[in-house]
Amino acid sequence: MERYDIVRIIGKGGMGEVYLAYDPVCSRKVALKKIREDLAENPLLKRRFLREARIAADLIHPGVVPVYTIYSEKDPVYYTMPYIEGYTLKTLLKSVWQKESLSKELAEKTSVGAFLSIFHKICCTIEYVHSRGILHRDLKPDNILLGLFSEAVILDWGAAVACGEEEDLLDIDVSKEEVLSSRMTIPGRIVGTPDYMAPERLLGHPASKSTDIYALGVVLYQMLTLSFPYRRKKGKKIVLDGQRIPSPQEVAPYREIPPFLSAVVMRMLAVDPQERYSSVTELKEDIESHLKGSPKWTLTTALPPKKSSSWKLNEPILLSKYFPMLEVSPASWYSLAISNIESFSEMRLEYTLSKKGLNEGFGILLPTSENALGGDFYQGYGFWLHIKERTLSVSLVKNSLEIQRCSQDLESDKETFLIALEQHNHSLSLFVDGTTWLIHMNYLPSRSGRVAIIVRDMEDILEDIGIFESSGSLRVSCLAVPDAFLAEKLYDRALVLYRRIAESFPGRKEGYEARFRAGITVLEKASTDNNEQEFALAIEEFSKLHDGVAAPLEYLGKALVYQRLQEYNEEIKSLLLALKRYSQHPEIFRLKDHVVYRLHESFYKRDRLALVFMILVLEIAPQAITPGQEEKILVWLKDKSRATLFCLLDPTVLELRSSKMELFLSYWSGFIPHLNSLFHRAWDQSDVRALIEIFYVACDLHKWQFLSSCIDIFKESLEDQKATEEIVEFSFEDLGAFLFAIQSIFNKEDAEKIFVSNDQLSPILLVYIFDLFANRALLESQGEAIFQALDLIRSKVPENFYHDYLRNHEIRAHLWCRNEKALSTIFENYTEKQLKDEQHELFVLYGCYLALIQGAEAAKQHFDVCREDRIFPASLLARNYNRLGLPKDALSYQERRLLLRQKFLYFHCLGNHDERDLCQTMYHLLTEEFQL
């Protein structure tokens, strides 16, 4: 010890004394621990003292004080360590024990949050120590040093032993009775401090990782409650059996200890080692998840499903009335049960269901809407589970719309199923027997409410419904308070707080999220008040996100505003701009999720916007469309495909995930931003048929600028196109002739110039050109030109092409020219069944003929046979004047054009020129001022 200058003694232990010393060689303070003089002659204790030093020296971890030097050549033996200024955990605990009031500084140091952070560091250290095969055996507040700079280190390794090593029986023999009344580490048969020993350790069983975990449990109990788990006087014998440890929540309710942490402590202090944590790693993960706010669930309520007291409402309902998308009988009666329990915005529900219950279908609503008792319970989120033919299907429902579905075959003959539903941190998750089935992200504030179920028979719920509360985070989100105000429709109060948070955290997630929610708040207020000025303020609020770290949210917010205002062109523009400009932005997935939801919403309503959102989803998230949804979409589009010329002329199947589907959707919606990419894709693949179809659609939609650019590209590259020996349906020469014919139509040249110069074209290309020419000629009141064009190509197309694709144009021309005799001859060739088939345009043309020869009443009587369940594009005029009428917002852009063309001809046949000319004007305006 000659090398060190001893300053003062700073501590004493069972075998050693610790001094503050100065090392002049290294110019630093050190802690020097030497064996007590009265024990220095005992070789066994000397070996134990040196073993402590070597164990500490072998452990390299921030939570273990490293050893600088070990001196064992002659007495006194000692070792040196860094000197850490601080105090023990015991000192800190003693400073607050039995005190009624604490200073602000001390209250912060001993808060649950501060202590839990320290305990997590302790767990990390012991996890490392156990990984090295070492047991501490004497974990207690005395042996935990808290440094002035947030260090938390484990002291006193004198009792440490390697896992599985036999207990060292020292020469000091202490009776069991003396051990049980001692608070000191006894260098005898039982090593450690009895108050921190597990029950099995007190009975003489060897130490284990589980006994260290028990000791940590006693430490954590004191940290949480500021009291000891055993209520006994000093010196009183510890009772090994039958002593109940009260939970931390019971002992210190004023400390607001989360139920989850209370459960963690009680698990650590379980009498049976098998019921404790299996490792410190498992314990540390639970503590980490709590600190991070990850969900760890604690059972708060067990709801007996068969007791009437569990439910605020339990009434029979017709399921189809509220969930028409579900595959159930219209007369299926179920029970709607709404709980008495108010759920939290973060919660977990557990149900044990019989197979019979799932065969009949089971619904979960979380939470029900404000108007649940008034029959409006289906607003919000819910899950529907149903087994059919050994396949379990789970549907996620939002505002009565199925937005997600997952199906899986059941391999075993299970008779019971554990269903769990979690709502946590923007996500809704459903688990079946521990397996994740569905996860949905919702980025608007969650709210609390009542839990509801829909079930055929309560007997199918086999056990109590478990309602679990999330452990939550010790750091409550600053958004929680304004979120609560928003959920309660206290818009002004929510807005003030959101703006304050946004200004306080510029550039941080909390800040931009608050700014976005401020916009949502203004939007909700505007919708409630139906105030146009407030909608403008919502746009202004979202604009504050411009070019910031969450720029995509500006456009998502604006899209929501335009949706409420029914300004759908602006809504789509906002979404497109964000998708294009911020395709790689971390927040863009929120916007993509919204686009997918808008598809589900508009498709369920059979709204015309479904076609537009289908285009977007097929580009950004095609996997979001399930096989079941794909089947329904294709069925819905089938009638439109039968009225689409390029689908009729192309025998290939129209598949959902295909370039042809994108073109088809563009044609019917009039939404063409993707037309350019479709062109380049087909051009790169030399797919001439696809190029012809694209040019046909562009010409029909009057997209002359696009066509002009395509013609320029074609002219530039025509010389590079080499002839191929492979026989192809269309050559690039055909494509060129087709393009120039389209250009002639645009220039409004006569039929002879268009068709005579292209007399070598195939029948398919002639049909395309004739269709475009005839539609233009009719709307320009040039019915005679249709006859001229027909004469030029009649001999160049097969007879079936004439009947399938040209005859209707010929009938229109006769109607325009009022050729009653010719029309009579034509219609005599059709049966009454054919003339009344509303799937074909002949149905409408015959109605126009009746209007021409008999008047409006005869035509409307003919139109009155339309079906109620379907609307066919070919017979829109008939449905418009039918008693059923056309549903609002149902007609796509192309259908509105088609209807105006049909009405234009119909009013001409009636001799109502004013209405006819109005339809003509509206048709041209619709083309010029495109509206989704």
UniProtKB/Swiss-Prot annotation:
Which superkingdom, per the lineage? Bacteria
Q: What is this protein called?
A: Serine/threonine-protein kinase PknD
As recorded in UniProt, its EC number(s) are: 2.7.11.1
Q: Name one GO molecular function term.
A: ATP binding
According to its UniProt entry, the function of this protein is described as:
Together with the serine/threonine kinase Pkn1, may play a role in the specific interactions with host proteins during intracellular growth.
The keyword Electron transport is assigned to this record: no
Taxonomic classification, please?
Answer: Bacteria, Pseudomonadati, Chlamydiota, Chlamydiia, Chlamydiales
**What PANTHER family is this protein classified in?**
MITOGEN-ACTIVATED PROTEIN KINASE KINASE KINASE 20-RELATED, SERINE_THREONINE-PROTEIN KINASE YBDM-RELATED
Q: Spell out the SUPFAM superfamilies in the cross-references.
A: Protein kinase-like (PK-like)
State the family it belongs to: Belongs to the protein kinase superfamily. Ser/Thr protein kinase family.
- State the post-translational modifications: Autophosphorylated on serine and threonine residues.
* Residues binding ATP: 10-18, 33
Its UniProt entry gives the catalysed reaction(s) as: L-seryl-[protein] + ATP = O-phospho-L-seryl-[protein] + ADP + H(+); L-threonyl-[protein] + ATP = O-phospho-L-threonyl-[protein] + ADP + H(+)
Query: Which species does this protein come from?
Result: Chlamydia pneumoniae
